[in-house]
Amino acid sequence: MLFNSLLTNFAALEVGQHLYWQIGNIRLHGQVFLTSWILLGALLVFISLGTKKMENDPKGLQNLLEFLWDYIRDLARTQIGEKVYRDWMPFIGTLFLFVFVSNWGGALIPWRLIKLPSGELGAPTADINTTIALALLVSLSYFYAGLSNKGWRYFEYYVHPTPIMLPFKILEDFTKPLSLSFRLFGNILADELVVGVLVFLVPLILPIPVMFLGLFTSAIQALIFATLAAYYIGEAVEEHH
């Protein structure tokens, strides 16, 4: 009986128990919207508090926000280049903050143990639809960056240095969003499931070090995603691209 009970509870943590919203003929993953709104709301409160009383000598939350701004600026400048990095800072910063907050929400909050009438909650980035959408957004962005800076000359990249490279470079355009999306999805989902299982088995002590490890890996994954997005954009706008 105990073994069967354990199996039942573990099964409740597996992928696929979504909270669906039906809008006409479209079925949406409601848990992604709910958790995204909660986490983005918390982020907006954090930013509002940090920018409420701006001072020349920053302290507390303002100091942290300015550190994040400087970090994103340096990341964009390094990967994209001095010429156009300012145009892409809002995009890279938004990507980084959304992925970072979503990842940390998954590491800190055992969403899957929150009982709902149907389905289950989860970190937005633990849903493959979210990570694929983010990756496709990155792909559209670097295409736009290349075309807006070079015009039709951008497509010379596909046959440089030889036309033989054409199929391989087209394939690369498909593998970039796939690697971005599955890397982020796999890491965050695995961390969320491990924390959920450990909270169920040993609810007080054991999950804590795993949660700290999850916070670290979640931050690294957000950094990797934003860095690769900036790198792809920088690659598209380079003159020798």
Swiss-Prot record:
Spans traversing the lipid bilayer: 30-50, 91-111, 128-148, 193-213, 214-234
Pfam annotation, one family: ATP-synt_A
Keyword Ion transport belongs to the record: yes
GO MF term set: proton-transporting ATP synthase activity, rotational mechanism
Superkingdom field: Bacteria
Family: Belongs to the ATPase A chain family.
Subunit and partners: F-type ATPases have 2 components, CF(1) - the catalytic core - and CF(0) - the membrane proton channel. CF(1) has five subunits: alpha(3), beta(3), gamma(1), delta(1), epsilon(1). CF(0) has four main subunits: a, b, b' and c.
Designated name of the protein: ATP synthase subunit a
Gene (UniProt): atpB
